[in-house]
Amino acid sequence: MQKIEFEKSKIFNKPKIQTKRHTEIIESLEKMLEKGVPDLTMSEFASKLKISLRTLYEIAPSKDKLILMTMDNILTKLGKHALDSVSNIESPIRRLEKYLFIVNQAVGPKFDRFMKDIEKINGSKKMADYHENFISTYTEKLLNEAIEKKEIQQINTKVFAVLFSTIGREFLNEKNRKSISTTPDENANSITSIILNGIKLKN
């Protein structure tokens, strides 16, 4: 059986020597950017964070990379939290349902403003794709385990894994957001539950 473990995203080059101070700065950036991406220069970011511009450039070489790296950290923490939260659940299908509900928070109200702003930044799709691919791989693994344990019917697990990993982004689409009153994460969780219940075997 393939073993899948959480690992830090490798799509961004981290500082060669990440000090405790660097970590504190990145955490401050996470809190700042959860409220939306401010229209600031690197110099203004440094001023807001009360650090030198040189220190900020040690963390990221440009504003876009700084923002993307910070969002990558936020999504990475959410992914690790999701994996930790389901680690003691024996049933693969119950583990999957809880895992997907947690990772769907990435399109929820907490990240609402930020996710809309970050779409304009070059490289954001690559970052989102990286995290979606991880979700898809882990989801496929759990679906295969659920079939082996006769919890769900025979399905194309790769197809369903891709579907589950991309539902949230579809509901985050501006056109869909305007036409649907409920939040993207609520919509994603609702569809996820319907699909999972539809493929479960009744014992």
What are these regions (language model features)?
Residues 105-138:
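Short secondary-structure transition hinges
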Residues 42, 71-79:
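Short, basic, alpha-helical segments at the C-terminal edge of helix-turn-helix-like DNA-binding modules
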Residues 85-86, 111-119, 171-179:
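Secondary-structure edge/capping motif, primarily at the C-terminal ends of alpha-helices
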Residues 20, 24, 28, 32-65, ...:
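Helix-turn-helix
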Residues 69, 82-109, 160-164:
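Hydrophobic alpha-helical connector segments
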Residues 1-9, 137-149, 166, 173, ...:
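C-terminal peripheral helix-coil segments that are non-catalytic and often amphipathic
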